[in-house]
Amino acid sequence: MKIAYIMYPGACYMGAGDGTKMQAEIWARELERKGHIVDRINPWGHYDWKSYDVVHVFGLGLWNYDMIHWGSGINPNFVFSPIIDTNTPMWQYKLATYSGCGKLRLYSQNYALRQLKPDIKLFLARTQYEADYLQRGYGIQKDKISIIPLSFREIHYDSSIKKEPFCLFVGTMTQPRKNIPRLIEAARKYHFPLKLVGNKGNSESENRLRALIGDASNIEIIGFVNDEELATLYNQAKVFALPSLNEGVGLVALEAAICGCNIVITNLGGPKEYYEGESVELVNPYDVDDIGKAILRALENNTAQPQLRETLIKNYNVSACVDKLIDSYQLLHT
């Protein structure tokens, strides 16, 4: 197959660690390894749109309307991964999809997607939770939705590295949904070692983080690291925590688990679907005590691994996930 990948414009600001971009790149490389052609669309380029078997768009936004509406007139084989990360009550979310007026060009991204339903052949969700928002929020037919789980990147796991008793976080520290203030508060209250890795923002944002940390010597802001350094941290950490207020999947948590970390993760949204039946700590992200006590339990847990690692490798390796993706793409031509 010949496939076009169109990434949401804001990804250009986010760097290599952007989850949506990472998801698309993992899929693209595996598709290419399996013999398919994947063009990563550049707005400055020129393309023969009719030549594509699939045009796959990533990321919900107002830009979708013109991109998909015009594009589907040239090539009808549009697939859309909206990436819906929300805890908004379903009734409220559904109401927002009706808020607009096409004749007056009054659009929200939710309204625009409802109008685009006829132009999209297939919607992809990463979890049943996300699929429910597509079906119940936008009124998309169940047979137009495929659930394709995300796969983890190939991170070097070194079993010879001795686990150290600290908790690791990886992500954009300045995003409110990542819930860093409560994670820091939990570390201060329960005195576990915490290492924060990722985008710490500008100097003003970093100063706010350091003000939250105060004189706590058990909390370290590391900031950006390269892939090799990240792999080392994954291999060293006993626990990985992602107590987000909302999260689609949390690829970094999957990566950490593959490297032998015990996992503490939000009980909201779709991430918990990836760990069903496994020994992970699900936490209420609004409860500092729940976060702190769960991390302490995970630091003491010596039985969750390596079973967790083995199960995730079996279920979410890139080859298996991309085979499901290919099956979904082929539905467009049946």
Task: List each language-model region with its residue ranges.
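Conserved donor-binding/catalytic core segment of Leloir-type glycosyltransferases
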Residues: S160-K178, I184-H191, K195
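Membrane-proximal helix-turn-helix segments that form the acceptor-binding/catalytic region
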Residues: G102-F123, D132
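Aromatic "clamp/platform" in nucleotide-sugar-dependent glycosyltransferases that forms part
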Residues: L245
